[in-house]
């Protein structure tokens, strides 16, 4: 049976359209290049992600309210919500992460140095936008996160407070520069 040319053309058109709409055909869409952040071998990898717009803020309340016994006198911080689909789906509680560098008084340094683990080969993973706030001539000591949480009075259960709960995940202290580097997360109800 021979198909006339008039019947063959519509079949080819349908086949071409169906092939173009095939969901199983791999697409080579150009992907957006990630923002080129500075690289610094002093720091561990920063693992938190967000869809929020990031902006370094110069403030101490973000540190001192979440870490009550820190006593920060100056600081630079990034706070953002986790990438959790909350923009398209309501979530009653929003999990956030915080990373920052803060100046602290000698009393805070003394409390933490007594409980330190020792010299660190890599500094805690902080967001690359904060690298410039960590002078290269400062030496840091790692503090166990469980010890830092206990000594500094963080409250991982305070989700209903104004600032939410907070738990330190990585922490280092510099006695010669009176700086701390912190990364942690919490929950806002």
Where would I find each of the regions flagged by the language model?
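Mature extracytoplasmic domains of secretory-pathway proteins
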Residues: 69-150
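N-terminal export/targeting and maturation segments
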Residues: 22-96, 100
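Extracytoplasmic electrostatic interaction patches
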Residues: 123-189
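C-terminal motif of bacterial Sec signal peptides marking the signal peptidase cleavage site
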Residues: 17-20
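Mixed-charge, polar/low-complexity N-terminal
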Residues: 2-3, 48, 52-53, 57-58, ...
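Bacterial N-terminal signal peptides that target proteins for export
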Residues: 1-9
């Amino acid at each position: 049976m021979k198909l006339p040319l008039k019947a063959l053309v519509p079949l080819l058109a349908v086949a071409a359209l169906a092939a173009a709409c095939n969901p199983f055909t791999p697409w080579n869409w150009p992907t957006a290049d990630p923002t080129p952040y500075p690289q610094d071998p002093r720091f561990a990898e920063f693992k938190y992600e967000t869809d929020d717009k990031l902006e370094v803020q110069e403030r101490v309340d973000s540190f001192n309210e979440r870490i009550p016994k820190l006593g920060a006198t100056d600081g630079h911080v990034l706070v953002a919500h986790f990438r959790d689909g909350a923009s398209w789906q309501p979530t009653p509680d929003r999990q956030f992460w915080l990373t920052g560098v803060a100046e602290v008084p000698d009393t805070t340094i003394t409390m933490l140095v007594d409980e330190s683990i020792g010299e660190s080969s890599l500094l805690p993973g902080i967001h690359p936008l904060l690298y410039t706030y960590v002078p290269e001539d400062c030496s840091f000591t790692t503090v166990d996160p469980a010890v830092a949480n206990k000594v500094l009075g963080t409250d991982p259960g305070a989700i209903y407070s104004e600032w939410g709960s907070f738990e330190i995940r990585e922490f280092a202290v510099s006695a010669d520069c009176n700086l701390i580097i912190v990364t942690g997360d919490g929950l806002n109800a």
